[in-house]
Regions:
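C-terminal membrane-cytosol helix-exit motif in multi-pass small-molecule transporters
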Residues: 164-184, 372-376
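Paired small-residue
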Residues: 6, 81-84, 92-101, 291-299
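Juxtamembrane intracellular "pre-TM" segments in multi-pass secondary transporters
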Residues: 178-209
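Cytoplasmic helix-loop-helix junction between adjacent transmembrane helices
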Residues: 97-135
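Conserved MFS/SLC helix-loop-helix module at the cytosolic interface between two early adjacent transmembrane helices
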Residues: 53-92
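Helix-breaking motifs and short loop linkers at transmembrane-helix boundaries and internal kinks
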Residues: 34, 66, 87-93, 233, ...
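Helix-to-loop junctions at the C-terminal end of transmembrane segments
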Residues: 54-66, 253-265, 349-350
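C-terminal transmembrane helical hairpin of 12-TM major facilitator-type secondary transporters
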Residues: 267-311
Length: 410
């Protein structure tokens, strides 16, 4: 694989870390700024909503520009946002830093996917894209636990300083290692042609499933530090190691979910969302039992991220004419789900329903996502059957209308 892919993955690692590590540091950040848990939760919701704006707005704005300079500019934006977060002295400067960093998120992964695919032969494109997204997976498996540990040991600001350094390293790597021609073999289309791909009803159903399917897990994950310490009885110092368990489940689920989706996307998503709903409900019921909590964490990460490859593949399948914008839009949809889950979980805590209530809220969102996915799958099956029926009828009519072969006497 080209070394430029490592630079792309490093950028993905930094972006994934800045998105997810805040969950483990939320109690420390809330205490430092003197705000409630729900108010601190907006550092996650605000980030997620800004990702949506960047995924759609920035990606649409740069579809006709050279991709390597755009990626570099996005990382400069990412670095600036994390630098502001690391130095923020109050709630709102921190929020502004989160928003600035988030604007680069969706566009980076959307455009980066095209660049990664352009660096390798056609037979290796999927592997190249997967390698770039390995940075995001590694951020959850290793970055979040150790970023949380660093924040607890040296203060949460130290984690954001570290993320800033990672961003600088990724920027240097992209400038030095990514070829200027990468991703230019497929010329960017006009914004009108990219938007035209969104006329498909299945694209919109897929985006709704992404929002609900991913939002359910984030309803539980956003306030997981509170659940682990206040309900399960774990010491705050053990939270980073428990997040390793979550990350290992995530890595395993992401890998196996991709293989299952290669065989049948719709069936995989319906089954995985159904199992995730059950896992979340069992987690809410057994959160007071430490051993069962550890098992639930692994399963929540596994089944939560087993949806990701299928959700991304489904949107791309039904929007083949919009490779850049569809990819960015689905990244935005993941983060709408992130914001929805975080907001609803915070609302249940504010209502005095306790620290397991975000998990129940997540289960409800996931069940809704499963229902939409089942509807979308059934609709797709009906359309496929109808298309085969029409095709067969046209073929039969053509054969009937053809004249009999004329036999020439010898």
């Amino acid at each position: 694989m080209p070394v430029g892919l490592i630079a792309l993955a490093l950028g993905g690692f930094g972006i994934g870390l800045t998105e997810f590590v805040i969950a483990g540091l939320l109690p420390d950040v809330a205490a430092d700024f003197g705000v409630t848990e729900a108010s601190a939760g907006w550092f996650i919701s605000g980030y997620a909503l800004a990702v949506v704006v960047g995924a759609l707005g920035l990606t649409a704005a740069v579809t006709r520009l050279e991709r390597k300079p755009v990626l570099a500019a996005l990382l400069v934006l990412f670095i600036a946002g994390n630098l502001l977060s690391a130095t923020a002295g109050d709630y709102w400067p921190m929020m502004l830093g989160r928003i600035i960093a988030a604007l680069s998120h969706g566009a980076y992964f959307g455009i980066g996917s095209v660049v990664a695919a352009g660096m390798v032969p056609p037979s290796r494109k999927a592997g190249a894209i997967a390698l770039m997204f390995t940075g995001l997976t590694a951020a959850n498996v290793l970055g979040v636990p150790f970023g949380t540990l660093l924040g607890q040991a040296a203060g949460w600001r130290a984690t954001f300083w570290a993320i800033t350094v990672i961003g600088v390293a990724a920027l240097a790597g992209i400038l030095a290692l990514v070829p200027k021609s990468a991703g230019t073999s497929s010329a960017p289309g006009s914004l009108r042609s990219e938007l035209g791909a969104f006329r498909s009803g299945q694209v919109w159903l897929s985006i709704v499933v992404t929002i609900l399917g991913f939002g359910g897990m984030f309803g539980a994950f956003t306030y997981i530090a509170y659940t682990l310490t206040e309900v399960s009885g774990f010491a705050a110092s053990t939270v980073p190691w428990l997040l390793v368990v979550f990350g290992l489940g995530l890595f395993t689920g992401n890998t196996l979910g991709g293989k299952a989706a290669d065989r049948n996307i719709d069936r995989t998503l319906v089954v995985v969302l159904a199992i995730l709903s059950v896992v979340l409900m069992v987690f809410a019921l057994t959160a007071a039992h430490p051993v069962l909590t550890v098992v639930s964490l692994a399963l929540m990460g596994g089944f939560g991220f087993a949806t990701v490859p299928g959700l991304q593949m489904r949107v791309m399948k039904y929007a083949p004419g919009a490779p850049t914008l569809a990819s960015g839009a689905n990244i935005g949809a993941f983060n709408v789900g992130n914001a929805l889950g975080a907001w609803l979980g915070g609302a249940t805590i504010t209502a005095g329903l306790g620290y397991t209530s975000p998990i129940w809220a997540g289960a409800a969102i996931t069940i809704a996502g499963m229902a939409v996915m089942a509807f979308a799958a059934a609709k797709a099956r009906r359309s496929a059957v109808m298309a085969r029926t029409v095709s067969g009828a046209v073929g039969s009519a053509a054969r009937s209308a053809a004249p009999d072969a004329v036999r020439v006497p010898r």
